[in-house]
Amino acid sequence: MSVDQQDDAPLRERIQENPGPALKWFAGALLLFSFEAGAVINFLTGLVGAPVDLPTLLTRDLIANNGYQTPGGAWKETFLNLAPAYAWAIRVVLVYAYAFIWMLWLWRGYLVFREHYRYADWTPRDDMVDRLRGHRWGQFGAVIVFGFIVLALFAPALGPTTVERTISNPYSHHIEYYNDQGQLENITVGSANLGSRSQGTPDRNVGPMQYDDFGRFHPFGTLPTGKDMFTFMAAGARVSLFIGLISIGVSGLIAVAFALLTAYYKGLVDLAVVIVGDSIMSLPRLLFVMLLSVVLGETWIADIYSGGFVLALIFAGTGWPFLWRSVRGPAMQVSEQEWIDAAKSFGQRPRVTMQKHMAPYILGYLLVYASMTLGGIIVAVAGLSFLGLGINPPTPEWGRAVNIGQSYVTTSSWHISFIPGVMIVLVVTAFNALGDGIRDAIDPQSEGGESDGAEVAASGGGA
């Protein structure tokens, strides 16, 4: 295949010419996926309310931390008869190690693509990646975002117990423990929760990294209802991530479509979108979201993911003008470039021109503002839950934990509000830091002054 033919060949044909490296990488990825396929499938099916129970390598069934302590001090029915805290810590370390290996393997896949299947020895994306790898603030954000995503994706494995056992149906599950008389008793999880409540006094509090009277380990302590707080926070991370990704995905598609249309056609098309977008942006967003949450709260759509889906659609419908405004400028810059005029003069269809020659150069900017917007959505969802709106109880949500723990801030149960509050601040800061890193990688002159429009457009994701 000649160089010119190779330049125009799709990736599929390039892989067919040299399938060896791609097959080796895919085999490794398939092996990694097989270890935790059940966790991923459970996450995807859980989004539509039909979770399945499939075996995985790092589940609590294999590395169990739910057991009981004998009068002699030994633990039974835990992994290797270890204390629940150690068994839980081993499982957490292995899950995060597994996720980190996945990240390394994805990076390896990118290097394989660069070495064997990319027709150019260098592209502007290479410099972007190098700048991002040296951006300490962006790296900080990436590490925290990575931890947040892993917490959400593997929430059932990371929690010391499950949402089903401690939150949804605690009276349908039982645990065993030795009472003060040294007798083995069987009690429902709900009854054990009542005896493990954190309510602000030393004798009614289970704080971070403590055991309750029934031998259960609580990394973040318990809630005023006695439910495990780490499990609550992990499940809440999954809810926040679901809402954020759906919202950003929908609003991002709308923003890109309108940005390309307004940049290509300009004139009345641009004016119409400006009027619609400005009208939506002029509304008090939080009040508008609260109004829609109440209005749509009694509809069938509010039952999907405990109200999370309707929240995602509301944030998408009210947030796309902000993303569109962010990428409209770069789209206008790209539309003035010579290659766009050349495509028009050769009679190329507008859809092909926008998709092939314009869209790649604004996706980098969309990624920057989307990462920052995602942090804002997490705060907004937490705020709505704090006010009693949004996610329907008893589905876990971080803002609800802040709300129910605010009366215990100055007591021994300070952890109930403090931990979710810190996590909200940390995750939102991390998304903003990651966005800053991506922005500086795309446009290295963004902090030092104005950069040339063509250079900025070319670095925004072109091949």
Which residue ranges define each predicted feature?
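Hydrophobic transmembrane alpha-helices
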Residues: 283, 289-292, 309-323, 333, ...
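Generic hydrophobic transmembrane alpha-helix motif, especially the helices
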Residues: 36-52, 60-90, 137-138, 152, ...
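Glycine-rich helix-loop "coupling/hinge" segments at transmembrane-helix boundaries
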Residues: 290-296, 334, 373-419, 423, ...
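Hydrophobic alpha-helical elements at and bordering transmembrane segments
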Residues: 132, 233, 237, 241, ...
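C-terminal transmembrane helix and the adjacent membrane-cytosol boundary/short C-terminal tail
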Residues: 297-307, 318, 364, 371-372, ...
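Membrane-topology segments of multi-pass transport proteins
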Residues: 1-140, 153-225, 450-463
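Transmembrane alpha-helices
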Residues: 19, 23, 27-30, 241-254, ...
